[in-house]
Structure formats: structure tokens, C-alpha cells
């Protein structure tokens, strides 16, 4: 099995059915594997379009958006879309080509420091140079080593208190399928206090799933607002950054009694 075939096998294992892409020299082996894998590929007119199409797909379906491009300038053209996805908390996976391993760092044809460029606009970015590296295992070991030197018990206690106060989990044996909005709202409705507010970030507010949730939420007696916020769990104190006067007015009207806040994120 080649690396490209392994990529397709991983995508299929995670129930990915649709990819957006723009081909180029270094990514062609992946396109060959894509053809054999039988996944749907939508050809865009440029790499920027592939990223934006993947974002739109994720917003409208609630599934992860996947886009592919070639190395160098093809990959750098994705950066705007990656930044947009990160700022709006949209799930997007990007796969790019790369020059041959011996040529990395030699200013080869269509080579760019895509890893360095993407670190600032992605949650995770890495180069796979060997199929023998167990990346997931290495990350787990590294995180466990870091935790040994951290005093995290105060954090754990804070989380335990928060979970005890707002006891809510949504667990359903549905694999990687999108969350059922009605089931989620029914669960929230049974647990919410009378003066609860649902808060979402701007990008999440635009996703199909959250749109559906918030539309139904209003009929369940929730107050809904869109803002950036950080919950400080010390007797339910709130530090809130608002983006418009309209949001501020809504909060002033609703936060008189400092209600509990349910965050969709």
C-alpha cells in the first residue's frame, strides 16, 4: 500500500465521501489513489476555491470538509481558507503535496515552507515523511510527559465543579454521523435553568447544524445570542467580549440575574 492509498483508506474509515481539489504535479499520486478509492471529487478553479468550498460543505452538512492541493504555491493558496476555518471553528482537513524528501529545504521547484505558514492558521499541522512513525502515539506520549510537570489538580477541581453544576453529556452510538439537532435540543431543554442563554461563535452560528439548533432552541424557551465569551467559573462570573451594540443590548437585558450559560462550541 502506498502513502496515497493509505490516505484514501483513512478518509474512507472516517466516512469521508466528498473532496474538493485542484491537481498539480506533486499531488498526482494522491489523485490516482482517489480515483481508485471511488470517492467523489469536485474540481475547483483554484486552490483558494477548494478551501472555501470545503468550508461551505462543512457549514451546510455538519460534516468535515476535505480539500487537496499540490505543493508550493498550490498549498500556500489555501492559507486564507485555513485562517477563515480556524477563526470560525469550521472542521476542515487539508492534504497537500510536497517535493521529494531529499529536496525539502533546498528551494526546489514548487517548494514552500507550508508547515511554517500553516502553523498560525491551523490547530494541527505536520509533515509525514515516514509511514513507520506512529504520529498519534507520539503525540499522546508527548502530552503525557508534559502533564507530569504540570500542577493540574486545581483545573480538574474547577472542571468537576462545573460539570456538577451543568450536568450534560450527549452520547449516542452513531459513529461519525452528525449530531441529531432535535435530540440535542431535547436533552438541553430537560436540563436548562429557566434563564439560560445559548451562546455560539460567529462561524458556528453559520453552520447548518447550529442554525437548526438555534432555530429550534427559541421554541424551547432558550435565549440565543452570538458572541465570543470566556466563562470564569467563580460563582458564575462572566467575562464577555461583544462584537456589536445589538449583542451588548441583548446581554444587558438578559444578564441582570447572571444566568447560567450553555455554550455551543
UniProtKB/Swiss-Prot annotation:
Its cofactor is Mg(2+); thiamine diphosphate. Residues 204-247 are annotated as: Thiamine pyrophosphate binding. Binds 1 Mg(2+) ion per subunit. Binds 1 thiamine pyrophosphate per subunit. It comes from Haemophilus influenzae (strain ATCC 51907 / DSM 11121 / KW20 / Rd). This is Putative uncharacterized protein HI_0737. Keywords: Lyase, Thiamine pyrophosphate. Gene3D superfamilies: 3.40.50.970. InterPro entries: THDP-binding, Thiamin_PyroP_enz_TPP-bd_dom, TPP_enz. Thiamine diphosphate binds at residue 47. SUPFAM superfamilies: Thiamin diphosphate-binding fold (THDP-binding). One of its GO terms (molecular function) is thiamine pyrophosphate binding. Belongs to the TPP enzyme family. Truncated acetolactase synthase; no longer catalytically active. It comes from the Bacteria. The lineage of its organism: Bacteria, Pseudomonadati, Pseudomonadota, Gammaproteobacteria, Pasteurellales.
